[in-house]
Structures are given as C-alpha cells and as structure tokens.
Amino acid sequence: MEEKVSLKVRVQKLGTSLSNMVMPNIGAFIAWGVLTALFIADGYLPNEQLATVVGPMLTYLLPILIGYTGGYMIHGQRGAVVGSIATVGAITGSSVPMFIGAMVMGPLGGWTIKKFDEKFQEKIRPGFEMLVNNFSAGLVGFALLLLAFYAIGPVVSTLTGAVGNGVEAIVNARLLPMANIIIEPAKVLFLNNALNHGIFTPLGVEQVAQAGKSILFLLEANPGPGLGILLAYAVFGKGSAKSSSWGAMVIHFFGGIHEIYFPYVMMKPTLFLAAMAGGISGTFTFQLLDAGLKSPASPGSIIAIMATAPKGVWPHLNILLGVLVAAVVSFLIAALILHADKSTEDSLEAAQAATQAAKAQSKGQLVSTSVDAVVSTDSVEKIIFACDAGMGSSAMGASILRDKVKKAGLELPVSNQAISNLLDTPKTLIVTQEELTPRAKDKSPSAIHVSVDNFLASPRYDEIVASLTGASPIAEIEGDIPTSAPVDSQEIDLNHIDAVVVAYGKAQGTATMGCETIRAIFRNKNIRIPVSTAKISELGEFNSKNIMIVTTISLQAEVQQAAPNSQFLIVDSLVTTPEYDKMAARMYK
C-alpha cells in the first residue's frame, strides 16, 4: 500500500511542478492576451506600433519567466538565474514558442547549479565566495545555454510540433470532447491546475499565436459542469448540502473557485458521470461553434472567461452557449442521480469527512486524526494554508482563519502558498486538505500539520484559535470536534421566535451566505420568520428574548455580551452546519 501512496504523490508532484511554473506568471499571460486582443490588426483598437510588442512577449518574455520560475523552485535565486540563461538557449535554438523547452531547461538549470553548490560550496576558501558564486552561475548557465541551443531546442521544437499536430488532428476529428472524460475526474482529484496550466496553457498560447484564439483554454476552465451539479443539489439535494449549494454557486460561477463543488461530487461518486457528461457536451458545443479564448482564464470565473474572449458579440455568445449546455446536461444527469438517491444522510460536512476518509484509506493513506504537536503561541509563529497551486480555496481559507485570529487578539501572520514552495521551518502551523497532507509533511516535516475536509467551512479553525488562546487544546480525534457551542439549541424556545439574525464581526461574507442558507431552509419548510444579518456592534437593537441570534463559537462571548437577553444558536460554520435543518424541524410557524 505504501508503494501506491508514494506513486500517487509522485504523480501529483509532477503535475504540480508543471503548473507551478506557469501559475505565478499567469498575470503576464493575461497581459499578453489583453495586448493581443486590443492592438493586433483585428483587435478592438488596432495599433501597428503596440502590436509589435506581441511577438517579443510571446517568444522571449513568457518562456523566460517560466524558466526563471522553474529554476527558482529548485534552487532559489541562483537556480532562477541559471534556469533563465538556459531557457534563452532553447528559445534561440528553435523557431516555435519555447514553453515546453522552458519547463525543461528552467528546472534543469536550477538542479545543475544546486548540485554544483552541494559539491563545491564547502571547499571555497574565505574571501572567494562571491567570485566563485558569480562565475559558477555564469559558466554553468553558459554550458546549459549551448546544450539547449544545439540539442534541447531543436528536439523540443520537433516534439512541440508533433504534439501540436496531434492536437490539431484530434480537433479536426471532432474527438476533443472526449478529453473531458479525463479532465473532469482529474479536477476533483487535485490535478486541475496541472492540466490547465501545465499542459493546456502552453499549447493554447501557441494556437493563439497562429489562429488568434484557442479552445484549449476552455477545456478545464468551463464552469458549466460544476454549476449544473450545484444547481441539482439546490433543487433535489437534502439538508445542509441543499441549503449551502446556493452560496457555493455564486463562489464557483462568479468567483471562479471550482474547488468549492468538489466535495459535492465526492459525496456521491456517481456524480462524476454528470461532470463528465457536462464537460463533453460543453466542449462539443465550443468546438461546433468554433469558440475559444485569447489567453488563459484564471480563475475559471465567467467574468474572466468573458474578459478574455475574442472581439465581437458572437464569440461571447458562443462561449456562453457552451457553458449553458454544459450546465444543463450536468444538471439533468445530477438531478436524476440525486432524485433516485434514497439515503437519509443530509449533512454535507459529515458526508465530506466520510468520503475523504474512505477515499484516503482506499489509496493507502492514513487519515490524519491528530496534530503532531501542541498548538500554542509558544509553538506557532505563523500559519500557512497550503494547496496544490497556492491560490483559490486556500486563499479563502486563509482569509477566514485570519479574521478569526484577529478577532481573538492574536498577532500571528496567516498566509497561503503552494505546497511545492513550503520550507521546512519550525514553529509553523500548516493547514492542508487531507488529500494533500502527505505531500505537505514531506516538504515540511518540522512544522505542525492540521488536516481539514474543506478549506471554506471547517470546525478545526475554531479549535485552532481556541488552542492558540489557551482556551482548549485541539481535539485529538476529528470525530470529537464539537458541532455546536455550549448553548444547546434544543433548549431554545423556537416557537416564540419572531426573527432570526446572523451576527458577524468585521467580515460579512459568511454571514450573508449563512443568512441565505437559513432563508432557503425556511422557504422549503414554509416558515415565515424574517432572517437578516447584523454587525455585532448593532446587536443592541435585537436584544430581546423573541429574537434568535446565530453566530460562531469564536464570536459567542462577544455576541452574548452585546445582546444578553436574546436567544442564541452557536454553530461551527455559518454555511454548512446541520443545526439549521434541526432547528427548522422544531419550528411550527
């Protein structure tokens, strides 16, 4: 079983290393796409002088950035410099944009100078360090430049041409939609960025240089399949999965954070069929209508997709139609699956944990049930949220915990980054999703590691804050995590509630989502009680026993002090808690 785990981790590392050379530089790709869309001959604002910048950016800037980043990943600044020099050799030794060559020469340059330093660094006599370091980087880079110019560049150019011809043949044979049979499951299994930015982006940029647009940018970024699945949960789902799907739809479709719908698919693995069918139908529509984008859409938001579409009304409508078809097809299939489902489990959070545990165990992984050390302000100096790409859901998770840490009066930095960029530093608390914890531990064994089911709604955040403030230690077993506060919702006289208020501190986002979740549940149960949000400083207006205030464990004391006469429902998450369904079942208004 250990061999299977290590193989899986190695595959993830390979895919991640490719995407991590591209993702930090997506801004440059977007800048090039905007420049192309505006100033080339058929752009929105044709300009011959500015159009001359398009070619050099494509040929030199973008590959050198990739090579620089690849070298930096291996050996810091010295690796980045040598990787850039080597990449120039590949660029000038070829007649095609050298993205794949940059992905080879960048890490190779970093690895070569790293091995040189390991062998000779300790042998340098005092006073000669700068001389040796500068000349070694220059000479190693020079040697790799010659190698890339005469060998790597031509070989990669031939391979790139072959791959491009293969993609063109697949497109001409109308077989491109079949790629979604692999793409959609891979997205849910943390390979979405590897596919999109490690494979499709380099190939797509070359297509844009030739044809002005590329359908490859739409294969993984299409939000249609996820939108259809979330909509099916909103109509045919049960419990907290149903009520939380509305907020998830907004984040997925407009925010472009596709990771938010992954747990909904993991809850019922048969929904992979809905995702694949939606992806296939969407790509088929894109291909039928000759749709494409001028640059990568990152994140996969409908706003970013529309912004990078070619000039004209029809190109935008063609893309929207492809997204719509994908959403409708995935919705219909997911609706059939959910409607036929007879299970009684209706807690998204519980199903998430069960699915993640079963998934990890089936792959030979041990589910992380405890932290590696005591969490306190003495043992933790910073908190890092780590994920495959270091963006998206980990950034949102970091934002949520950062807000909780500030409210607790702690001065701890909370940031997010890619697992591949983690350093082995002590006194660091690293939060990862269970699927990625083995890789994080491998990169940073000295850190304290905490696994969560879902970055966007985890009860472990309140546990971490409580442990850091000395209120209580982190629960050793995940199953022991409390799902509500000391105030028991069973004791609340629910039949004498005239209004429900969701309280928030500085950030209103999760409170708004929680408010919409409760409203959706009340509508389904025909409960006519108004639900609103309020800042803690405004709770004095709701200080009455016929008002129920909903808040989280971390804000409980502050909220009860602001409105001591109100009734309270304390939950672990304002969005995914099962307490809302239990509350509605006991209300008869």
From Swiss-Prot:
Record gene name: mtlA
Gene Ontology cellular component terms for the protein in this record: plasma membrane
GO molecular function, one term: kinase activity
Stored PANTHER family: MANNITOL PERMEASE IIC COMPONENT (PTHR30181), PTS SYSTEM MANNITOL-SPECIFIC EIICBA COMPONENT (PTHR30181:SF2)
Subunit field text: Homodimer.
Pfam families documented for this protein: PTS_EIIC (PF02378), PTS_IIB (PF02302)
Protein name stated in the entry: PTS system mannitol-specific EIICB component
Organism of derivation: Streptococcus pneumoniae (strain ATCC BAA-255 / R6)
Domain notes: The EIIC type-2 domain forms the PTS system translocation channel and contains the specific substrate-binding site.
Catalytic reactions on record: D-mannitol(out) + N(pros)-phospho-L-histidyl-[protein] = D-mannitol 1-phosphate(in) + L-histidyl-[protein]
Its membrane topology: Multi-pass membrane protein
Annotated TM spans: 26-47, 52-72, 136-157, 167-187, 275-294, 317-338
Cytoplasmic-side positions: 1-25, 73-135, 188-274, 339-589
Residues at the catalytic site: C387
Coiled coil spans: none
Enzyme Commission designation: 2.7.1.197
Functional description taken from the UniProt entry: The phosphoenolpyruvate-dependent sugar phosphotransferase system (sugar PTS), a major carbohydrate active transport system, catalyzes the phosphorylation of incoming sugar substrates concomitantly with their translocation across the cell membrane. The enzyme II CmtAB PTS system is involved in D-mannitol transport.
Segments on the Extracellular side according to the record's topology features: 48-51, 158-166, 295-316
NCBIfam families per record: mtlA (TIGR00851), PRK15083.1 (NF011663)
Keywords for the protein's UniProt record, in alphabetical order: Cell membrane, Kinase, Membrane, Phosphoprotein, Phosphotransferase system, Sugar transport, Transferase, Transmembrane, Transmembrane helix, Transport
Domain PTS EIIC type-2: 14-347
Domain of life per record: Bacteria
Major enzyme class: transferase
